[in-house]
């Protein structure tokens, strides 16, 4: 009976140590799940961008810019349209640059998802504290945050420039007609 009483506290201590290790990995798994949620949200946000509208705007701009180049404008006309033309070019360039970023961001997000899945799997399949994975998790956290910021900024710029394009394009088309 005395041996059982001595072993019970030892068993309790062992159970506490085991639960601490599992809780540590559980905390890291929770962090990975949160990062996966952010990445999934970013993927969804990029899918909502109407890239067809952007491509159509770029095609219209290409056509209008070629018409402007073909048109023989005198010095007064050039001065009158300079600001609209300049703003139009800036808008079109920003639309183009940011539309090109979308595929890169999609690839980055796909890589992030794979990395997070692998890290989560490593934490889940380990029965011990995985300090060796901590630096990878910190690194991946930084990458996910940076990518999310890039996604947000790219979408914001595309939406702003698409709105500007509609206004500027009508002015350019007035000049052409």
What residue ranges belong to the model's regions?
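Short, well-ordered helical secondary-structure segments
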Residues: 7-8, 41, 145
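Bacterial N-terminal signal peptides that target proteins for export
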Residues: 1-10
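Generic signature of mature, soluble extracytoplasmic domains
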Residues: 65, 69-107
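Extracytoplasmic electrostatic interaction patches
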Residues: 89-90, 94-177
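C-terminal motif of bacterial Sec signal peptides marking the signal peptidase cleavage site
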Residues: 16-19
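Immediate post-signal-peptide N-terminus of mature secreted/exported proteins
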Residues: 21-83
């Amino acid at each position: 009976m005395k041996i059982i009483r001595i072993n019970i506290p030892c068993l309790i201590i062992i159970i506490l140590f085991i639960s601490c290790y599992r809780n540590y990995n559980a905390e890291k798994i929770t962090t990975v799940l949160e990062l996966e949620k952010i990445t999934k949200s970013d993927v969804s946000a990029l899918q909502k961008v109407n890239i067809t509208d952007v491509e159509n705007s770029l095609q219209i701009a290409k056509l209008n810019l070629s018409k402007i180049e073909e048109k023989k404008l005198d010095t007064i006309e050039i001065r009158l349209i300079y600001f609209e033309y300049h703003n139009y070019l800036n808008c079109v360039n920003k639309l183009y640059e940011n539309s090109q970023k979308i595929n890169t961001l999609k690839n980055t997000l796909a890589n992030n998802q794979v990395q997070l899945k692998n890290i989560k799997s490593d934490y889940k399949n380990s029965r011990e504290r995985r300090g060796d994975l901590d630096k990878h998790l910190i690194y991946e956290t930084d990458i996910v945050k940076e990518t999310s910021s890039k996604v947000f900024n790219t979408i914001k710029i595309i939406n702003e420039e698409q709105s500007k394009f509609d206004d500027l394009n009508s002015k350019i088309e007035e000049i052409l007609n």
